Design a protein with these regions (language model features):
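Periplasmic polypeptide-binding modules associated with outer-membrane biogenesis and secretion
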Residues: 23-153, 159, 173-203, 219-228, ...
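Outer-membrane beta-barrel translocator/channel fold
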Residues: 182-190, 215-229, 250-280, 393-432, ...
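Residue-level signature of outer-membrane beta-barrel architecture
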Residues: 162-164, 201-203, 237-241, 288-294, ...
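Hydrophobic, lipid-facing positions within transmembrane beta-strands of outer-membrane proteins
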Residues: 154-158, 193-197, 229-235, 282-288, ...
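Transmembrane beta-barrel wall of Gram-negative outer-membrane proteins
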Residues: 189-321
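Transmembrane beta-strand segments that form the barrel wall of outer-membrane beta-barrel proteins
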Residues: 138-150, 156-158, 162, 169-186, ...
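Outer-envelope beta-barrel architecture signal
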Residues: 126-128, 138-142, 154, 168-172, ...
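C-terminal outer-membrane beta-barrel translocator/porin domains of Gram-negative envelope proteins
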Residues: 305-493, 526-555
Length: 556
């Protein structure tokens, strides 16, 4: 019996040592791209980074990593299909592999020169050459496009949107429009026409990953003495290293905006006009940040810690008015962010999490105002076969400042004021708060997917297949708890905003990066019998209790 046990242990130990002696590992030596479409290789390499320093302990581990890279590429919504092949070279020692690699690369500190490491002297390393095959999805759309936002504007436009501009995997938008601006009661207030465009062009500048950002917005309101505009251009430059990047931003804007000529504040007897004469001004903005990778998570991504600093200076030829708190400066913001996230698209539903926590310290050198604050956001997505669940939890608090959360609430007019006898409060918008917690919940449901080439009569139209689509309907609920200046309460459900409604979403199957969304939101605190009368609304002015919105893109 003892003899058999000894033989068994000797056999096991022999297998163990043979496994060590003959252990094989892998690292990605070369990556090639076979792109069908206009996507540029540099853009794809920048958007989805591939680790050429990591040692994989088995072929299975390597395959799982490459499968995850495919998912990341598909998550960009730039490609219809992504596949790969890999060629594994003959065995060679890790030491030889590293020596060969070091002879073919420059010896510097940038990401490309960091060599794969393996602590085992007996491990044999195989070099792997990977080739990715991608097919671009349709990315350019030009169409007549109505846009409507209750209490804001009704716009008829010709819209051009390109989600892969010049193969850059960056967005390009351009609009030529005619708009009817509406007041809070949805009555026409003014008529305007104009055009706008916004795009970024990534390129390599030495060792810097650079994006040239440009924006043009030009409009004329009938009856005004001159047009308005916002011309901006800037550079974002990143120097990448293995576990961090150095990012520098610079931007200049030239703006003509009559909103800063003066403004009305308050309602009723407290409505007052403040004259600034700051309609023509310039904006200088510089920023610096260091995203640092504090943890790598397999099949997930990276957890980042990012310290940052940003400075903004608004100026005009005769100086910014002392009462123009929107433009008065210069101002500087220091801060730090911890963030991570991974959201996978499963057909037209999302699955994953995005989370960020930011601490901010702001200072205005003109007003000497110090404004520390904190923001946090958690986005959750869960995909099922024919429906999805989505939630966005957003919170912020500032010591000496406010932020407007109205755009996050569908059904709540963001420009409504407090109904107060205190003139200092009556001039404040009720959706401007020093602290707030906003919760959005959506449940998109797949209604149908239609292929027009399979529909009788319509299938005789040659281009019918280009308009194949999936339609979804999504009930939603939005809630905002906040510091209420009129009632003096904080995060009290009885002094809150609650809205709900329904969205219709269309996904063009040939344009994966584009969604068309229509939304009807209702102010439930004023219209829903269960809530009406039970939630205090005396603190805000009376206005329309619904909001309709039509546009491109998802709410969050």
């Amino acid at each position: 019996m003892l003899t058999n046990m000894k033989k068994f242990f000797i056999f096991v130990l022999t297998l163990f040592f043979l496994n060590i002696v003959n252990a094989e590992s892998y690292y990605i030596k070369d990556v090639n791209y076979k792109i069908t479409g206009i996507t540029r290789q540099y853009a794809l390499e920048t958007k989805v980074k591939i680790d050429k320093k990591k040692i994989f302990e088995s072929e299975d581990e390597l395959r799982k990593y490459l499968d995850d890279i495919v998912i990341q590429m598909l998550n960009t919504r730039t490609f219809d299909t992504v596949t790969y092949t890999c060629v594994i070279d003959d065995l060679q020692s890790t030491e030889d592999s590293i020596s060969e690699k070091s002879n073919t690369e420059n010896n510097d500190n940038t990401e490309e020169s960091v060599l794969p490491q393996n602590t085992s002297n007996n491990t044999q390393t195989k070099n792997v050459t990977v080739t990715f095959f991608t097919n671009d999805t349709k990315h350019l759309i030009a169409t007549p496009y109505p846009k409507y936002k209750s209490g804001d504007c009704l716009t008829a436009m010709i819209k051009v949107k390109d989600t892969n501009f010049a193969g850059s995997m960056e967005n390009f938008t351009a609009n030529v429009d005619f708009a009817v601006e509406l007041n809070k009661d949805d009555e026409p207030e003014s008529f305007k026409t104009g055009f706008s465009t916004d795009f970024g062009i990534p390129f390599k500048m030495g060792k810097l990953d650079t994006v040239w950002d440009n924006s043009i917005d030009f409009s004329y309101t009938f009856g005004d003495s001159s047009p308005e505009w916002n011309f901006g251009t800037g550079l974002k430059m990143a120097l990448p290293f293995d576990k961090y990047s150095l990012i520098f931003n610079i931007k200049q804007s030239f703006i003509k905006n009559f909103d800063y000529d003066g403004e009305w504040k308050g309602t009723g007897e407290y409505r007052t006009y403040y004259k600034y004469n700051d309609s023509l001004y310039f904006v200088e903005n510089v920023g610096f940040s260091i995203p640092i990778v504090i943890q790598e998570v397999n099949n997930w991504g990276r957890i980042y810690y990012t310290p940052f600093v940003n400075a903004t200076y608004n100026w005009d030829f005769d100086g910014i008015h002392n009462d123009d708190t929107y433009l008065l400066g210069p101002g500087m913001t220091f801060g730090q962010t911890i963030s991570t996230g991974r959201v996978n698209w499963i057909e037209n539903f999302r699955n994953g999490i995005n989370v960020s926590l930011t601490q901010i310290f702001g200072y205005n050198f003109n007003s000497y105002a110090f404004n520390p604050g904190i923001t946090a956001e958690l986005k959750l997505y869960k995909a099922f076969k024919n429906l999805g669940l989505s939630a966005d939890l957003y919170a912020y608090a500032y010591m000496n400042g406010t932020d407007n959360f109205g755009s996050r609430l569908r059904g709540i007019r963001k420009d409504q004021y407090y109904d107060s006898d205190d003139p200092n409060i009556a001039i404040l918008k009720s959706t401007d708060a020093q602290a707030a917690f906003v919760f959005n919940f959506d449940m998109p449901i797949k209604l149908f997917r239609i292929y027009w080439e399979k529909v009788p009569v319509i299938n005789k139209i040659k281009a019918s297949s280009k308009f194949n689509l999936e339609a979804q309907i999504s009930p939603f609920l939005d809630i905002a708890l906040f510091k209420n200046e009129e009632t003096g309460t904080s995060f009290n459900i009885k002094d809150s905003f609650i809205s709900g409604g329904i969205e219709g979403i269309v996904y063009p199957l040939r344009w994966k990066g584009i969604q068309v969304r229509g939304s009807l939101g209702i102010d439930l605190t004023r219209k829903m019998p269960v809530l009406k009368g039970k939630v205090n609304q005396d603190w805000r002015e009376s206005c329309k209790s619904y909001e309709i919105s039509i546009g491109i893109g998802l709410h969050y």
